[in-house]
Every structure is written in C-alpha cells, then in structure tokens.
Design a protein with these regions (language model features):
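Compact beta-sheet-dominated domain cores in extracellular/mature segments
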Residues: 1-131
Length: 131
C-alpha cells in the first residue's frame, strides 16, 4: 500500500511545465495541457498584484517544484515568486503568469483584455507581451 502512495507524492513535487504553441494570435506560452498563460501589464517585477476577486478570474499558474521548460521555452527565463499565501507562482522573464478561468486548451478568450486595472496579454517565447 505504501508503494502506491509514493508515486503520487513524488508527482506532486514535480514542477509545472511551460511550453510554446502556435495560437491564433501567434506563438505564445501555454502549460503542458495547452492552456494559454497570461501576464498582467501593471505588474513591474515578479511580485503579483492579483489577489481575491482578480485571482478568481485570473488564477495564478502555480508550481510545487521548479518550473520545467518545455518546447520553445528558455529555461533561464523561468522562475517563481512567492504569493502572500505562501504558494509558488511561476514567472517568465520576471512576469508572474496567470490563466484565465474560462479558457480551455482549445480556446483563448481574453487576449488583450482590460480588467482589474490593467491589460491581460499572452506571453511570447522571448518573455514580452504579445500585442
């Protein structure tokens, strides 16, 4: 019984994979499942400004381990920041990363949307906002 619990425990410590895929907006960062990730343009540096209602609409991309660089992603640009609740949020080129709550791997709904005092944009492989 203990052996069965061990793989699940070690899988939980794995880092979140970020990779590049071609979207209808151009090449952009996505997670392993193909779900788009965004940056929030009012954030300067790795500290998240999106909490409470904002984080319910734009959940942070979290990781339990070191984030993993998938296809097209620069390993050196991946990092983490610690949120107020102690969870680790994935960053890329210094930008905290987020999902949009209603996106799916097949559908990007909120590219270049203004909400919560800033603009939400997909992230290019070089770490800049896709405009």
């Amino acid at each position: 019984m203990q052996a069965a619990a061990e793989p699940a425990k070690s899988a939980a410590k794995k880092g979140t994979t970020i990779k590049v895929e071609r979207t209808k907006f151009g090449k952009a960062l996505v997670n392993r499942a193909g779900r788009a990730v965004y940056l929030f343009d009012i954030e300067e540096g790795p500290t998240s400004e999106c909490y409470d209602e904002c984080a319910r609409a734009w959940p942070p991309v979290l990781t339990k381990g070191k984030p993993l660089a998938g296809k097209g992603v620069s390993k050196g640009k991946l990092g983490t920041t610690t949120r107020r609740d102690g969870r680790r949020q994935v960053t890329y080129a210094g930008h905290p990363l987020y999902f949009y709550v209603h996106d799916t791997p097949d559908e990007i709904l909120c590219q270049d949307v203004v909400e919560f005092g800033g603009r939400w944009l997909l992230v290019r492989p070089n770490g800049t906002a896709l405009r």
